[in-house]
Amino acid sequence: MLRVAWRTLSLIRTRAVTQVLVPGLPGGGSAKFPFNQWGLQPRSLLLQAARGYVVRKPAQSRLDDDPPPSTLLKDYQNVPGIEKVDDVVKRLLSLEMANKKEMLKIKQEQFMKKIVANPEDTRSLEARIIALSVKIRSYEEHLEKHRKDKAHKRYLLMSIDQRKKMLKNLRNTNYDVFEKICWGLGIEYTFPPLYYRRAHRRFVTKKALCIRVFQETQKLKKRRRALKAAAAAQKQAKRRNPDSPAKAIPKTLKDSQ
């Protein structure tokens, strides 16, 4: 917020400086520099400051088999005599001039014809998974351009969780259709964990303490093993050299007598 406010204030200052008072103009008017001639946009300062994070590169679609922009919309494909219409009208009724909703409808219909046996059945579990997948990919394309859009990120995560539940249900009921949908949509199904526990602060500290205690016990065991190995080595050395200094003393006494 502070960065946005600083940008707006700097833009307002530059705008105030450019409005120079000219005494020759009637009523003490002010002369402005030609912003349009230089390619600058003095208006909508808040929008310029707030949307500075938007990626300028066009978001690339992840679907390799996107329909061409010259295809007609779904409502006008079966109209009689549509081929004799002027090219301008065809362009207005094509995907090139359509909105995002119409594009998603065309993509969903394309996947339904490719994967599902009955494309007209839109209430089945497979059809709902396809509709969710198309929506998820549109959210991903939007987030590639608008990286800080938290609302669409939340919608994306919720849709992914919902699709996981549907895929799990479909896998338990009809495995062949499940494999076909995963192959057609390019989905890699991962199994959920058998046990999940939320890592709060007390759990994390307890786990770190247990790991530290385990490491210290391993160090103590290693030292005990080293001491035992040293004691065993000393015993073996004594067995190899049976002449001890206690036995050597009486021999010297006998020799002296």
Curated annotation (Swiss-Prot):
Which intervals of the chain are annotated as region Disordered? 225-257
Signal peptide, first to last residue:
none
Cell compartments where the protein resides: Mitochondrion matrix
InterPro entries attached here?
A: Ribosomal_uS15, Ribosomal_uS15_bac-type, uS15_NS1_RNA-bd_sf, uS15_ribosomal
Transit peptide range is 1-57
Coiled-coil stretches are none
List the molecular function annotations (GO) for this entry.
RNA binding; structural constituent of ribosome
Q: Does the keyword Transit peptide apply?
A: yes
Q: Is Ligase among the key words of this record?
A: no
The Gene Ontology biological process terms listed for this entry are: mitochondrial translation; translation
* Assigned GO CC terms: mitochondrial inner membrane; mitochondrial matrix; mitochondrial small ribosomal subunit; mitochondrion; nucleolus; nucleoplasm
Q: Name one Pfam family in it.
A: Ribosomal_S15
**What keywords is this UniProt entry annotated with?**
Mitochondrion, Ribonucleoprotein, Ribosomal protein, Transit peptide
Q: What is its main location?
A: mitochondrion
Family statement drawn from the similarity comment of this UniProt entry? Belongs to the universal ribosomal protein uS15 family.
Describe the subunit structure.
Component of the mitochondrial small ribosomal subunit (mt-SSU). Mature mammalian 55S mitochondrial ribosomes consist of a small (28S) and a large (39S) subunit. The 28S small subunit contains a 12S ribosomal RNA (12S mt-rRNA) and 30 different proteins. The 39S large subunit contains a 16S rRNA (16S mt-rRNA), a copy of mitochondrial valine transfer RNA (mt-tRNA(Val)), which plays an integral structural role, and 52 different proteins. Interacts with METTL17.
User: Mind telling me which HAMAP family this protein's record contains?
Assistant: Ribosomal_uS15_B
Name of this chain's protein:
Small ribosomal subunit protein uS15m
